[in-house]
């Protein structure tokens, strides 16, 4: 979006404000009795779990993941094509209030975000919600795009191209190993806290104060 502004506008004086999160960060991590991955929100035609399901299925069939590993889909309304062999592993949960979705995200071991291949410069609100959960984030996206850079910066998770089945399998196994060994990723909390909504609003107010002199921070 910023790139488009720079192309079509006569100046480049732009400020990008992220969505951010507005709840308390979590430091007391709970591990589930079975390795559990989750996606919170809705899928769309180009951003769907097909390759995630395929990689998960192959890992179970190859006996690299235990057969009782779980996937939770929370809040999706569209019909999903779940491979028959992992249908018992996949649970579908009706849409819930945002605060309840945050609570439910704490009762899993890996949180997944999925972006369509080739989609650039887009964050989702759930990504910022995930940052403060202290759960590993697995992003299926362009690792060189903004989501990959955010996860590298905050050390909150991993990225892999959504079209790379073998790469997705490797990252699922990495997340599984973290769960199995009861590890907690060494997040950079100082950088994560930059993405609270309070701090994002502060950036906006400082910008307005500097540019217009109207607002005092």
Residue positions per predicted region:
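Conserved donor-binding/catalytic core segment of Leloir-type glycosyltransferases
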Residues: 29-47, 53-56, 200
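A charged, aromatic-enriched C-terminal amphipathic alpha-helix characteristic of glycosyltransferases
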Residues: 163-167, 180-211
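Short acidic alpha-helix that forms the nucleotide-activated donor recognition element
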Residues: 97-109, 132
């Amino acid at each position: 979006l910023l790139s488009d502004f720079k192309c079509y506008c006569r100046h480049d004086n732009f400020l990008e404000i992220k969505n951010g999160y507005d709840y308390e960060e979590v430091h007391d991590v709970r591990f589930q009795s079975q390795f559990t991955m989750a996606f919170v929100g809705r899928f769309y035609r180009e951003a769907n779990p097909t390759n995630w399901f395929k990689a998960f299925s192959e890992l179970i069939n190859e006996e690299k993941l235990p057969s009782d590993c779980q996937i939770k889909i929370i809040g999706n309304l569209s019909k999903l094509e779940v491979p028959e062999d992992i249908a018992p592993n996949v649970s579908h949960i009706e849409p819930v209030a945002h605060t309840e979705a945050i609570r439910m995200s704490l009762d899993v071991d890996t949180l997944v975000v999925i972006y369509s291949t080739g989609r650039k410069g887009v964050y989702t609100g759930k990504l910022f919600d995930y940052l403060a959960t202290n759960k590993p984030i697995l992003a299926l996206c362009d690792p060189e795009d903004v989501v990959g850079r955010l996860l590298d910066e905050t050390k909150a998770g991993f990225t892999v191209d959504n079209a790379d089945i073998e790469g997705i399998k490797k990252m699922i196994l990495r997340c599984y190993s973290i769960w199995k060994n009861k590890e907690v990723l060494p997040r950079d909390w100082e950088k994560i806290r930059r993405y609270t909504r309070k701090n994002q609003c502060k950036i906006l107010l400082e910008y307005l104060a500097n540019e217009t002199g109207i607002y005092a921070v």
